[in-house]
Amino acid sequence: AILFSPIGEEIFFRGMLQRALEERFSVRTSTWLECLAFGFVHLCHHGVVLGASGLMLLPRSAPIWFVLMVLVAHLFAWLRKRSESLYPAIAAHAAFNFVMGTCIFLALWPASSEL
């Protein structure tokens, strides 16, 4: 998740999808559409869960997570445009995943030092 997901996601979102959208829309509109798609796809991480009655949207965390993912996607898109390369976006995406994974790990780590 820290390395391979960012490679695939950046190739798809900032590479293929962004370019395809730019053939039809302005750069600004294309970037917004691509970032909104990124946010929507990532709702499954913290905004949507599978309950007994099917998929459920978590009313508190879903909007926060969606906005965070759209903002992070804008950072990745800016890095891609500024550098004219996917590598900085991939590196930033990998760093973001590492930090998020570390935060989740530390939050779930037992409070006591006994194992």
Task: Briefly describe each language-model feature range.
Residues 1-115:
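Transmembrane helix-loop-helix hairpins at the membrane interface
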